[in-house]
Regions:
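Short, small/polar-rich loop/turn modules that mediate ligand/substrate recognition or access, typified
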Residues: 71-78, 137-139
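Active-site loop immediately N-terminal to the catalytic Tyr-X3-Lys motif
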Residues: 44-50, 72, 114, 132
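Active-site helix of classical SDR
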Residues: 19, 55, 63
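Residue(s) in the substrate-gating loop at a strand-loop-helix junction
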Residues: 39
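Short C-terminal tail/terminal secondary-structure segment
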Residues: 44, 126-127, 138-151
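Active-site loop-to-helix junction immediately N-terminal to the catalytic Tyr of the SDR YXXXK motif
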Residues: 45-53, 65, 95
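Single conserved hydrophobic/aromatic residue that forms the stacking wall/gate
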Residues: 1-7, 12
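Alpha-helical segment proximal to the catalytic Tyr-Lys
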Residues: 24, 68-72, 135
């Protein structure tokens, strides 16, 4: 098995430093919601993305650990993670531009609802987690995967 951490360390490093530097500011202001963006790959492993899967799983557990820390030190700062499936983004479109429509169809077939996530699906989850409507939600993951993890 060929393993490489190239690029994957950034996945956890950015979330770690985001939490580290946001927490004091949020405590000073009295409240806040940290939303770490992970991936469905942090919940459902794949055979060819070992480092990426591991890094995204680390973001999931970092979020849980920060949530528990905050719950014990201040009741007003929450921390959760978001785990979207493949989404219609410019990055994905660029990756697929060199391939046929077969690759897009293959991705869609992996998802029980047979379609990719829309950016709005992810944005709506972020808005919910950032709002007071989620004031009792901390230390959890929101999975936006069209049923992929239910299989």
């Amino acid at each position: 098995i060929a393993l490489s951490l190239v690029g994957s360390e950034m996945c956890i490093r950015d979330s770690f430093y985001g939490c580290k530097y946001a927490l004091p500011l949020m405590r000073d202001s009295g409240n806040g919601s940290i939303i770490n963006i992970s991936s469905i790959s942090g919940i459902v492993a794949g055979h060819n993305f070992t480092a990426y899967n591991s890094a995204k799983a680390a973001v999931r557990h970092l979020s849980k650990s920060v949530a528990l820390h905050c719950a014990r030190t201040t009741k007003l700062v929450r921390c959760n993670s978001l785990h979207p499936v493949f989404a219609k983004t410019e990055i994905l479109e660029a990756l697929l531009s060199d391939t046929s429509n077969d690759m897009l169809s293959k991705l869609e077939r992996q998802i029980p609802v047979r379609k990719l996530a829309e950016i709005e699906d992810i944005a709506n989850a972020i808005l919910f987690l950032a709002s007071d409507e989620s004031k009792m939600i901390t230390g959890t993951e929101i999975v936006i995967d069209g049923g992929l993890s239910a299989q």
